[in-house]
Amino acid sequence: MKVFFIDLHSPWSRTNEHEWYYCLGPDNPDRPELDARWRRFREELSSATAGGPLVYDPKWDIPGGVGYNQSERMGTSSCAWFNRLPNGWCAFCIEYGYGLCGGVFTRERGRDLGRRCMRATVRSLLHDPSVDDDVW
């Protein structure tokens, strides 16, 4: 069985990046397949949020090893740790900004975004041949 992990939260520090919501990519150079899975999820998330109250735009994403998204710089994140597990399919972080995130961030809009995020997660898992059909 494969396990998927998403860390959802507001960032621990405020920088210019934190005016939008975005994904932090995996920082595990020993597992190149994670980048393809992260890319697929981002495509699905972009599609799932299109037309919603809070639209995800991958241009704000920070790949692993870039900017503050470096294990050497911030220590081992929960996602980097999870990606070392043998049954870990993929883990990454979605940061919710301190700004408007492309629209007014309300409780209802946050819930809508969460539902759309889960839709993208399921679609990502369904398109990966390494995931067994019997887990559904």
What feature does the model see in each segment?
Residues 1-136:
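Structured catalytic-domain cores with a bias toward divalent-metal coordination
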